[in-house]
């Protein structure tokens, strides 16, 4: 399956199969507001048991956020599962290295739902199930250099499901594999930098996006990436 990632800047057409759960955000079993991020150590698993976590009223403010603004920080190889990220947050989940998210839901995205960075070529991050609502910009921001796999995810009212960093200070090739995703009322499913050799593979994706895969001319720091076209294949 992942061998398809070798096809640079490619969109693989496939029969539509809406596999993202369309029943809405699960009902939380409990709610917790924390004054600081929860850190999950390298290689460890945090099962939230369907509780809701946020950062408290007023946490969603304008501008880019950092680790201090996240609800969860996952160290390399950590897993977060069965959790709802509430609307009172600036940043949702930060992965410092490859990570796994299983059935992680975002009620109302403020800046970015998921940021992946610190991963290297050959590393794989997995986002399995779950979903996100009301992401005015990006759901998944990828700043590292590995592969992000998004499987059976649901997105509604969003800017982009996945974006390869357009202006990180240090740039590299990034890969994304997206399968079984359902995405409505939004923009790109994936935005990738063609000049850095990024790849996007879409398989069994159900969406009303006009252009599911968009190509950009990325740049390194202090600049604005330019949209240059659409994927073909």
Curated annotation (Swiss-Prot):
* Localization per record: Secreted
Q: List the disulfide bonds.
A: none
Q: Which cofactor does it need?
A: Ca(2+)
Which N-terminal stretch is annotated as signal sequence?
Answer: 1-17
Q: Which GO terms describe its biological process?
A: cell wall organization; pectin catabolic process
Q: Does the keyword Signal belong to this entry?
A: yes
Which GO terms fall under molecular function for this chain's record?
A: pectate lyase activity
- Per the UniProt entry, the Enzyme Commission number(s) are 4.2.2.2
Gene3D superfamilies for this protein: Single-stranded right-handed beta-helix, Pectin lyase-like
Q: Describe how the cofactor binds.
A: Binds 1 Ca(2+) ion per subunit.
Q: Which SUPFAM superfamilies match?
A: Pectin lyase-like
**GO cellular component terms, semicolon-separated:** extracellular region
Q: What class of enzyme is it?
A: lyase
Recorded catalytic reaction(s): these are: Eliminative cleavage of (1->4)-alpha-D-galacturonan to give oligosaccharides with 4-deoxy-alpha-D-galact-4-enuronosyl groups at their non-reducing ends
Would you list which residues are glycosylated? Answer: 167
Any idea which UniProt keywords this protein has? Calcium, Carbohydrate metabolism, Cell wall biogenesis/degradation, Glycoprotein, Lyase, Polysaccharide degradation, Secreted, Signal
InterPro entries cross-referenced by the UniProt entry: Pectate_lyase_PlyH/PlyE-like, Pectin_lyas_fold, Pectin_lyase_fold/virulence
One Pfam match, given by its short name, reads: Pectate_lyase
Report whether Signal shows up as a keyword of the record: yes
Q: What does this protein do?
A: Pectinolytic enzyme consist of four classes of enzymes: pectin lyase, polygalacturonase, pectin methylesterase and rhamnogalacturonase. Among pectinolytic enzymes, pectin lyase is the most important in depolymerization of pectin, since it cleaves internal glycosidic bonds of highly methylated pectins. Favors pectate, the anion, over pectin, the methyl ester.
Family note:
Belongs to the polysaccharide lyase 3 family.
| Protein name, per record | Probable pectate lyase F
| Organism of derivation | Emericella nidulans (strain FGSC A4 / ATCC 38163 / CBS 112.46 / NRRL 194 / M139) (Aspergillus nidulans)
Task: Give the taxonomic lineage as stored in the record.
Answer: Eukaryota, Fungi, Dikarya, Ascomycota, Pezizomycotina
What gene makes this protein?
plyF
């Amino acid at each position: 399956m992942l061998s398809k990632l070798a096809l640079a800047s490619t969109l693989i057409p496939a029969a539509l199969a809406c596999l993202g759960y369309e029943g809405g955000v699960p009902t939380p079993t409990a709610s917790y507001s924390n004054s600081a991020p929860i850190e999950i150590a390298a290689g460890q698993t945090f099962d939230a048991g369907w509780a809701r976590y946020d950062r408290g009223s007023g946490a969603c403010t304008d501008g880019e956020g950092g680790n201090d603004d996240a609800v969860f920080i996952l160290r390399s190889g950590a897993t977060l599962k069965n959790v709802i990220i509430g609307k009172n947050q600036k940043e949702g989940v930060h992965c410092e290295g490859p990570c796994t998210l299983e059935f992680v839901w975002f009620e109302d995205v403020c800046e970015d739902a998921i940021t992946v960075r610190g991963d290297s070529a050959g590393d794989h991050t997995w986002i399995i199930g779950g979903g996100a609502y009301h992401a005015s910009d990006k759901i998944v921001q990828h700043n590292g250099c590995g592969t992000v796999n998004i499987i059976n995810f649901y997105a509604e009212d969003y800017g982009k499901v996945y974006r390869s960093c357009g202006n990180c200070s240090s740039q590299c090739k990034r890969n994304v594999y997206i399968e079984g995703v359902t995405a409505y009322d939004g923009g790109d499913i994936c935005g990738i930098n063609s000049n850095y050799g990024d790849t996007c593979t879409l398989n069994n994706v159900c969406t009303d996006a006009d252009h599911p895969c968009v190509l950009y001319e990325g740049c390194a720091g202090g600049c604005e990436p330019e949209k240059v076209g659409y994927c073909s294949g």
